[in-house]
């Protein structure tokens, strides 16, 4: 079968071609393609009947290749944001994915998205025992980096920017009911100072303390865990001399250094068994001509009792505040 259409904006689907086959073992699409005047999509997939019945041995695979051309981006915008289109790269946005395996082990060989000379994002990893809540596990690694992202500025009137060389790396992990994520945001000037700065933290390796050991400047790092069975969570955030002005060039917020720790159990904050503990420190906050430092805060909740405290001790002020309720 072939299907074509033309939308009022001028977006035109010029061809569609595909084939579906099935037997007692598999449903498969050996070929499916869609094309517009500037873009294309290619899909191949296999799904075992066992997978649909949540059995572990059924085959599961998919390959996707897609490109969205600048011409179609212009048609979707309908002539708006002409400055954005003038600075948008004359290259297609590319998306590629390749996954293969079964419910015992699903391997994400490739997940890529990017715009040439602008940015790229990549992910890969394995997921294990997906139907077993106690044995499931796996790791997904993520990496993203920016290059020339100036074409975004017209969309936000210059209020938001991503400087060339800004990067994000991360790892997502599963171990039974526990999930973990470790994200590292680096500005172009970031440099590792200790081994911990580059050591991955996962649900398998949580003995290090970000708030005490992470020292990389011009960087921010988030580590978090969540237990699906207990609704228990833990998170650490460390920000070291992160220049917020690089992201918000029209704002007056510059260097920020701070750390935050949170842990707890339960998501119903009206239940007596729900508890959480939060503590943090602001070591540096540069706003306009003000350079603030020396702020500590804590908050705890347990058995319907909330306690919060703020301590500010620096050259400009000395303040203590407390809330009990």
Predicted regions and their residues:
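Interface amphipathic segments
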Residues: 2-325
